[in-house]
């Protein structure tokens, strides 16, 4: 046997993560511009809707173009990196509990947070209306938002960072910082909302550290936004897209009720996100320790 026969074939070198992530973002922006232009053209020429005020159907179409852009960019990069598309963590099989956990956590956050706000007199319910189609349309819109942002920030960016030698919590912090920066041009943004957006990125990314799946983050993200805005009547990250089920009044806009930015701009939200993030990490570390103990005993 010659030396050539026993030399293993080396795999071709792959781009480092620090190069992959900017390249992915660049490709995403290219396709976002392309698909966004097509979507706005369709709204203008076919539906006769202005891009500045597209209405709920228009928002859904524009958000769909962004989701398509991030899926295209992810597919290109994963093929380039010789990684399976399943690596994004979109599989529902075996992760349906994550969908329920995300929903229940969002409900619990608002039961506590909204309940405290009412009890403290920081918000008042002054009106009620139930519009089925508005609530359903808003649910679809925020589903698209959740899937798009989770693929972008957790599925690809955090997923790639976790394949490096970086500490997993540092990787989580980096991806959460990028998530906060994604919202830097939102209306009514200031220091506390930016801190809370960073904490939201930590909260949404924490389950991914232990499952490498997006079911929990997508569900939590979806119901977080949907309950906050269309149901309870807050602004969602400074934005107001549709009519809401509850009409709220804030006697004074301050850091306890979030003011014009919405519940995400409140100190109550800050405390709750820290508590729930710690809870998820505690649960994940405990689960990992149990799995390692079982593996070693076998």
Go through each PLM region and give its residues.
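N-terminal, membrane-interfacial amphipathic/helix-forming hydrophobic leader that caps
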Residues: 1-85, 229-298
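Functionally important transmembrane alpha-helices
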Residues: 34, 193-254
